[in-house]
């Protein structure tokens, strides 16, 4: 069991836009913390957010070469209220998030592809590492008529508070 919420919208640093309002991403998570939503306590809560986090561009660089803690077990235990969250943003704070007008956002394309082909023994953080690799290496903006927007790059930003492996 897990909760998965995907938000595909416009945004800027610390703000997401809806049709009739704007809100902070934290407002999405707030209602699902263990103290506010006990039925989801101990269950993974995944948020995939496809939105700009600013207007900075990443021109990338060219490289010449590519190159669990032990604890006492107990019948009952306490967890932090923000445990078991994972938030995957399509880009790093302050930066533009790219999309193809025909195929959609780079992040969602890569996420869907990696989830579709993921082995059942691959945990979500491994899957998201491959998503980040795919977005970073396989995509580049192609707008030769707009030189400042041409050949730009992107990399997702993954924030994990998961306290166990999650495999689909």
Task: Locate predicted features.
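Cysteine endopeptidase catalytic domains of the caspase/legumain-like
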Residues: 1-168
């Amino acid at each position: 069991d897990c909760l998965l919420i995907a938000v595909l919208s416009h945004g800027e640093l610390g703000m997401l836009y809806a049709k009739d309002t704007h809100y902070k991403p934290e407002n999405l998570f707030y209602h699902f913390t263990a103290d506010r939503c006990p039925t989801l306590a101990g269950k993974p809560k995944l948020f995939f957010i496809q939105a700009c986090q600013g207007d900075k561009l990443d021109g990338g660089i060219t490289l010449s070469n590519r190159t669990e803690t032990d604890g006492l077990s107990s019948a009952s235990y306490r967890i932090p209220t923000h445990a078991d969250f994972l938030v995957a943003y399509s880009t790093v704070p302050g930066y533009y998030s790219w999309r193809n007008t025909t195929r959609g956002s780079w992040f969602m394309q890569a996420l869907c592809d990696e989830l579709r082909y993921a082995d059942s023994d691959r945990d979500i953080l491994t899957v998201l590492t491959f998503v980040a690799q795919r977005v970073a290496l396989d995509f580049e903006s192609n707008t030769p008529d707009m030189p400042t927007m041409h050949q730009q790059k992107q990399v997702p930003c993954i924030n994990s508070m998961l306290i166990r492996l999650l495999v689909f």
